[in-house]
Structures are given as structure tokens and as C-alpha cells.
A protein has these predicted regions:
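The canonical Cys-X-X-Cys-His
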Residues: 67, 71-81, 91, 141-145
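Gly/Gly-Pro-rich "capping" loops immediately C-terminal to redox-active cysteine motifs
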Residues: 68, 83-126
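Sec/Tat signal peptide C-region and signal peptidase I cleavage site
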Residues: 21-27
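Flexible coil segments in periplasmic/lumen-exposed cytochrome c-class electron-transfer proteins
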Residues: 43, 130-188
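Electrostatic cytochrome c docking/interface patches
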Residues: 33-70, 126-130
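Bacterial N-terminal signal peptides
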Residues: 11-21
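Bacterial N-terminal signal peptides that target proteins for export
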Residues: 2-13
Length: 188
């Protein structure tokens, strides 16, 4: 009826099927229950994007003179005195253009839009207290960094109207693509 070889093959196939079924049924780990479902209020609080044209900038104001002390208190430990180097990298100064072997990618030589300074600072600085700066403080720090890079004067006020008007030295240094955003993703 069954040969030894056929019987062994059949038993092996049944065992493999049972083992595979056991692994699939009982071996799968449950999905970890991490986080929570984002509420509309959560999403609204995260919607802090600033666009190059200034869309999304909050009300507030600041000057480089106001930002200097704040920089010394909040930023110099990582970015050095006056933003010229440190473990967090230089934000100002630099003598090597972007086409050199070791280019300086500081704000004045690399960043194409002044509004990006505000956006990045508000989201990601200071590193030990993200999101802790008020809009006025971020405007003051932005003004100070622009001043340190020779782009504005010490008393020039940065706000939602003046900041997008700053023409950064490397504004035309990137290859741009036209992107059409779906209506649902355009800022309100």
C-alpha cells in the first residue's frame, strides 16, 4: 500500500503543514499599542509650517539687538559666540564659497529663504527645549542671525511682513522644480 519512502514524505508534509500553521496562528506578535489617535486639536497644534513666501508666519517681532542676548543664553553653547562655529556648527561667518572644496554652508551663504530660519528655529531649537521659544524670541534670533551674516542691520525689525521680503544671497543657487500641491495640502 504505502511504501516507506512515500509514508515518510507524507508524514513530513503533514508535520510541515502543522508547524507552519502553528507559527502563523500563534507565533505572530500582537501590534504594540503605542501612542494615541491624533485629535483635530493635536493636528492643529502641529500645523506650524512656514512657507518661503511667509505663509504661516505668526504675529510677533524682533530685532538683532534683542536677539543677541537671547543667542548668548540659548544658542552659543552649541553654535559658538556670535554663531561662528561650535559643536552645533557655524551659523555665520565662513570664507569658503559653495563651489570650494570645503564649502561653508552657513545661513548667509547657503540658505535660500529667510523664512526657513524662523521655521527651523521654532521647530528644532534650542535642542534641549524644542518649541520653548515665543514668536517674538524666534523673530529676534532670526534677525540676529541675519545680522551676523551681513544681510540686515542691527535695528531692522523682523516680523511676518518684513521677513519674507529678505532676499537671501543664495536664493537663486538651487535648481527649482515646480510642484503643484493638491488643494487639501495647501496652507489655509
Amino acid at each position: 500500500m504505502f511504501t516507506n519512502k512515500l509514508l515518510r514524505t507524507l508524514v513530513g508534509f503533514v508535520m510541515l503543514t502543522l508547524l507552519t500553521s502553528a507559527v502563523v496562528a500563534g507565533g505572530a506578535r500582537p501590534t504594540p499599542q503605542l501612542g494615541k489617535v491624533a485629535t483635530p486639536e493635536d493636528v492643529a497644534a502641529w500645523n506650524i509650517s512656514i512657507f518661503p513666501d511667509g505663509t504661516g508666519l505668526p504675529s510677533g517681532r524682533g530685532t538683532a539687538a534683542e536677539g543677541k542676548l537671547l543667542f548668548a543664553q540659548q544658542c552659543a553653547s552649541c553654535h559658538g559666540d556670535e554663531g561662528i562655529g561650535g559643536p552645533g556648527g557655524e551659523l555665520a561667518g565662513g570664507n569658503y564659497p559653495l563651489n570650494s572644496e570645503s564649502p561653508d554652508k552657513n545661513i548667509g551663504q547657503y540658505w535660500p529663504f529667510a523664512t526657513t530660519i524662523f521655521d527651523f528655529t521654532r521647530r528644532a531649537m534650542p535642542m534641549n527645549a524644542l518649541g520653548s521659544l515665543s514668536a517674538n524670541q524666534v523673530y529676534a534670533l532670526t534677525a540676529y542671525l541675519l545680522f551676523r551674516n551681513g544681510i540686515i542691520g542691527a535695528e531692522d525689525e523682523m516680523n511676518a511682513v518684513s521677513l519674507p521680503k529678505i532676499n537671501m544671497p543664495n536664493r537663486d543657487g538651487f535648481i527649482w522644480i515646480d510642484v503643484v500641491l493638491p488643494k487639501s495640502s495647501k496652507p489655509k
